[in-house]
A protein has these predicted regions:
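Surface-exposed, low-hydrophobicity beta-strand/loop segments enriched in small/polar/acidic residues
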Residues: 1-193
Length: 193
């Protein structure tokens, strides 16, 4: 059975310390930030704007801070009222802040779809790889297009570590677009796995 090519970014599913604690931390997005951030995108502390987050570029050695889940614009420029969204698109605010909610527990586990470059293999588990953005995030659903770069799986130097396959009978674990359980390998709050 072929897997469906329907990326969803990084979706939290639990953590390695035994609980299903899905706590988020509030960070800030700079006013008028031009880069969109979608639910499920990996984010980092912005080097150019201290104290703010930015979308994590795929294939990079910068430590992630976590995964974006949504944002609250204190005062939406078009309505003057607070607005929550599961994705961020360029907003020029006149007052208030743009607050981002981020899953930043370094021991959080996530689900992510593998890309179409290489079929999944049992030997993938325990290896690390970067993410790849072969699809854009959706402004309709707000969901990320981020995928795991399966052809990049190796023993060192990658954003994410493959922990397991999902065990979902609707997902062929040895085909392209397999769903992986992963954990951050490169994270600002811990050393590499």
């Amino acid at each position: 059975m072929a897997n469906i090519d329907a990326p969803f970014g990084l979706r939290p599913i639990g953590n390695t310390v035994g609980s299903s604690d899905f706590q988020m931390t509030e960070y800030l997005i700079p006013d008028n930030e031009a880069t969109s951030i979608f639910q499920g995108d990996a984010v980092e502390i912005d080097d150019n704007n201290a104290g703010f987050i930015a979308v994590q570029e795929a294939v990079t050695n910068v430590d992630n801070i976590g995964v974006f889940n949504g944002c609250l614009i204190d005062s939406d420029p078009s309505t003057g009222k607070p607005k929550f969204s599961n994705f961020y698109s360029q907003t020029n605010i006149t007052q208030g802040k743009i607050k981002a909610f981020v899953f930043d527990n370094p021991y959080q586990r996530f689900l992510i779809q593998g890309d179409s470059g290489t079929a999944a293999a049992a030997a993938d588990i325990g290896k690390v790889a970067d993410t790849v953005a072969t699809h854009s995030g959706s402004t309709t659903t707000g969901i990320s297009g981020l995928e795991l770069d399966v052809s990049d799986l190796e023993t060192t130097d990658g954003q994410l570590k493959a922990i397991a396959f999902t065990g979902d009978p609707q997902n062929n674990e040895l085909a392209i677009h397999a769903n992986y359980v992963v954990q951050f390998n490169e994270h600002a709050h811990k050393t590499q796995l």
